[in-house]
């Protein structure tokens, strides 16, 4: 699991889902925003197997990082095997970010990257659930495990994962989606040590 400090995010993000640390912020405004979020947000998720991917990332990894007001994954699907529509294999670069909501800005608190392969199966309840997740290793085994897990899709994964601009585009895309489906007014996001960046909430992404 690739954990990233907020300091590292400020130096090297977006490599994209998250860093450990805390944002400088006004505590009173922060608490007010957290309360508002808890009272008003019903997190609406993507449909089908992508909903299960988001849920898994939030539940399994978002909770491991320093908490924020809201957890928003960033998922770049590298490839899928949907031969069996009730048992889908998803290869992806999976990021998780926790944010505090301050004014009109999503302020990054923590997050990390969890690339790998998920098996997502439709249960008796008609909903998809992640049943297995094989994650790329950190450190010495990183390259070998990435090539093994992604197979002939490794080059596609590497091209995305090593491209900061592409990672940032994917992150913004998923932030915009989250804001749209939840009808939230936030217009910017901000990583620690960086100026706030505008979110194009009217985008059709």
Spans of features found by a protein language model:
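Positively charged n-region of N-terminal signal peptides that target proteins for export
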Residues: 1-4
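Sec-dependent N-terminal signal peptides
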Residues: 7-14
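C-terminal motif of bacterial Sec signal peptides marking the signal peptidase cleavage site
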Residues: 18-22
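Low-complexity, intrinsically disordered terminal/linker segments enriched in charged
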Residues: 131-205
């Amino acid at each position: 699991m690739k954990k990233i400090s907020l300091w590292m995010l400020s130096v090297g993000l977006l490599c994209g889902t998250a860093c450990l640390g805390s944002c400088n912020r006004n505590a009173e405004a922060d608490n007010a925003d957290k309360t508002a979020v808890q009272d008003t947000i019903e997190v609406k998720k993507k449909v089908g197997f992508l909903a299960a991917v988001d849920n898994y990332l939030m539940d399994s990894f978002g909770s491991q990082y320093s908490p924020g007001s809201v957890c928003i994954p960033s998922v770049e699907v590298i490839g899928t095997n949907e031969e069996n529509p009730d048992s889908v294999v998803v290869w992806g670069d999976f990021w998780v970010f926790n944010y505090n909501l301050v004014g009109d800005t999503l302020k990054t608190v923590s997050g990390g990257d969890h690339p790998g392969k998920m098996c997502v199966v439709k249960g008796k309840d008609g909903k998809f659930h992640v049943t297995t997740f094989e994650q790329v290793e950190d450190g010495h085994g990183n390259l070998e495990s990435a090539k093994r897990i992604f197979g002939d899709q490794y080059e596609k994964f590497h091209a995305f994962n090593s491209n900061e601009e592409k990672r940032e585009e994917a992150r913004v895309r998923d932030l915009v989606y989250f804001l749209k489906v939840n009808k939230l007014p936030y217009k910017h996001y901000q990583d620690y040590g960086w100026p706030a960046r505008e979110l194009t909430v009217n985008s059709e992404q």
